[in-house]
Amino acid sequence: MNVKNPPFSVVRGSAAARIALSFVHARDRIDLVAAEILAIEARAEQTFFCDDTGAYHTFQLPHVQLEFAPHIGARIHRLTSQILDEELALLVDGEVIVRPVVREPIGWRGHMSLSANDMDEAEQLAGRLRRCWVNPVLRVV
């Protein structure tokens, strides 16, 4: 082994310690590592497409937008398709941060949004979710 230039690896502890975000319901649990979360963004407005008119409408609706790797979006969609009108717990660091009621299947397009009462609440929720993107610890192996 070359002592002057030792190899490095990124280590964040056990498998459980590497979980960034979890979706938990009695039917299933989906654990995500940080690399499977592509974006977390607090937004003030949300745009919807109206099937009846074919038009897009934008409303002042504070929320947090989450974007996932495609395979994760598919798993979330399968789960939420089965649990309509039921709670789905979202955990960060093993702590439940929100328990939204699933009103429609989510995740099919690889993203979802979590409603907030105002932008301050959206920013706080986004901040808690971003905690999963901590700087890794480097260790000589």
Stretch-by-stretch model annotation:
Residues 1-141:
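Structural signature of multi-pass, alpha-helical inner-membrane proteins
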